[in-house]
Amino acid sequence: MDAMEGRTSMKDLTDDISLSAFRRQVEVATTTATCPSAAAIEKGIPIYDGAGASETVAAEWRAILGEGAGVFVVKRAFKDLGAIDAASAVFRDIIADERGPGKAAGDHFAAAGANDRIWNSLQKLCLRTPDVYARYMANPVIDMACRAWLGPGYQLATQVNQVRPGGKAQAPHRDYHLGFMTPEQMAEYPEHIHRMGPVMILQGGVAHCDMPVESGTTKLLPHSQNYLPGYIAATRPEFRDYFEENCVQLPLEKGDAIFFSPALFHAAGENRTADVTRMVNLIQTASAFARHMESLDREAMSLAVYPHLAALSPEGRRAVIAATADGYPFPTNLDRDPPIGGLAPPSQQDLLTRACDEGWDADRLASALAEQSGRRRA
């Protein structure tokens, strides 16, 4: 009988959740056969050199995220460390502005107030300092990783997490979408949704400083994304205990990036240093076909960054446009926004790309974006 036959929800599988079965999934070696282009494998995690990253490695990254280790690191993902420093300065200003009596941005999996958190740091950086944003997001490695897993039209958002000395660790977990539900809610969704959910999201992060393991770099359990009932299992004490006993951590240097499946068991670590304030810009990227966690004003972001796009390289400009504008033309109002000469109307990314190619002035772009937005409303 097919394993799917007769199952209508994950409730049918919860009684079969087994730590021994989980261990068989995760206690496997990561070999060069699964990541031949990697510069090294450390603690079961493939390590790549950003200087040599190209589109040819996309299939390899897909395999790692899908059925491989579930995580990889790109050293020197940012060639321009000045862009990291400039963005870090802006983020520190935002943290200072948002911190105040009675204010705490909170953390989904750690105590409120233990860390500094900037929600929607992508939009805040773009609107506050669009020149820094353009320089920062003109990063082909981030674009390649997102395209490798999600294809074009992806929706990128970021959140800054700054952990001061003494900052506590997160509880181990899986991430959005299903990871942000109670076990009872998770169990309402059928098995194929638990299989499909991780395909719709890519998690990642950019190191904004040198981060030794003692500063609390992310704790990871390679291959744990392969355990189907893992969203529910990750909430259970015996699985959390196993995670704490077997997880691995890697040091990161400023400009390194890490990418992993949202289904990978992971948790931010405790900052046990006396003098390292760990800052990471967390990246959460959704498929064009998925709902994102955060809402962004991508029209305002497109207008803010537009004057700075002409100075970028073609690949840098493509990366910034992909991170900024909406790449999927639906949902829309097909009475007012019908597809003409194709199957879909132009997306916001199409419009921003056309403006760059044809050298529009800012007023023309603003009018075109406003008209497009108006056509899409119900």
Give the label of every model feature segment.
Residues M1-G66, V320-A378:
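Fe(II)/2-oxoglutarate
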Residues G6-I17, G50-A53, H208, P212, ...:
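Active-site environment of non-heme Fe oxygenases that use a 2-His-1-carboxylate facial triad
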Residues D16, R24-P183:
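Non-heme Fe(II)-dependent double-stranded beta-helix
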Residues D80-G82, R164-G166, P212-E214, Y227-L228, ...:
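Flexible loop/turn segments at secondary-structure boundaries
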Residues D85, T217, Y231, E270-R272, ...:
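Short conserved micro-motifs at the rims of enzyme active sites and ligand-binding pockets
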Residues M144-A145, Q170-A171, L178-Y242, C247, ...:
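Catalytic core of non-heme Fe(II) oxygenases with the double-stranded beta-helix
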Residues Q159-V160, G204-V206, N281-T285:
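A structural signal for short, well-ordered beta-strand segments
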Residues A234-P307:
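Catalytic core of Fe(II)/2-oxoglutarate
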